[in-house]
Amino acid sequence: MSKSLLSLFVFMTFLTLKGQETLGEIERLDPQLDLLIPKNASIEVLAKGFVWAEGPLWVPRLNGLLFTDVPKNTAYLWTDKEGLVEFLNPSGMTGHAPHSENEGANGLALDPKGNLVLCQHGDRRVARLKKWQFDKPEYETLVDHYDGKWLNSPNDLTFNKNGDLFFTDPPYGMKRQDEDSLKELSFSGIYKWSFSSGITLLNKSLSRPNGIALSKDEKTVYVGNSDIKNAIIAAFDLVDGNLVNQRIFFDAKTLKRKERGLFDGLKVHSSGVIFTTGPGGVLILNAEGKHLGTIRPGKATANCAFDADEKYLYLTSSDILARIKLK
């Protein structure tokens, strides 16, 4: 397909709606929320037409937001200037590993050197993009095995300042999840990886570890557990590279009874406030775990990300990309 025809196809399939459509509402439960989100803020739809949008990541060198459509095995770039363009295809299923679903990348992150690192569902690995390019992407495997066994389907990730990678590995990228015949590990782990020391299993107590983030002082690790029977955000102290003092930071089991959705992606604001997708939309929690409010797009929301200056929070909500202005 020629580039002109491809551009036309993308334009016709994915409608960019910047400034033309809003949806949902913002629920305010505490005055602290007014310090983060303007009272007149709305949820602005930027693009729609996806199957399951995920993994939003602001990339300064591109001055835009990368995100994935997991079932489409594709990653997109959205910028204020150009709108939406296809960025990576394939994004996460290249035939690298035995797989039961043709799913692409999920979580995205930049390492301390600015390289793009992807949790690749279909390839069952965490990989690095070799070159920043639109066509024919090439990936380098960082980690795909633990104890001689294939990982399940790495889901979300974050780096500390030293370049250590922390990631979660639930079985969501496998067709039958825990019952999938290709699943080799008997648990869903939280791992640390580095070039110097390789992979280390940090914790395997959570049934569905999903979104993961570090506090700004890198002393605490937050992990969302996307299990309908145990809908919690767990917190751990990070001590000498290990996770200790596991505790419940926020318990949503009661909230889950009346709201749709489970914990998925989460990000930590420079103020220490946590923005986490979960029951009802995007929950905003202060550093003590108090629920300040919820951004309610009216759709299942997978993940969220700030831009470089924290002027906007971007949401991947089911079939749409949206954003909300911050203070």
List each model region and its residues.
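Bacterial Sec-dependent N-terminal signal peptides
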Residues: 1-21
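Sequence-structural signature of mature extracellular/luminal beta-sheet repeat domains
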Residues: 20-327
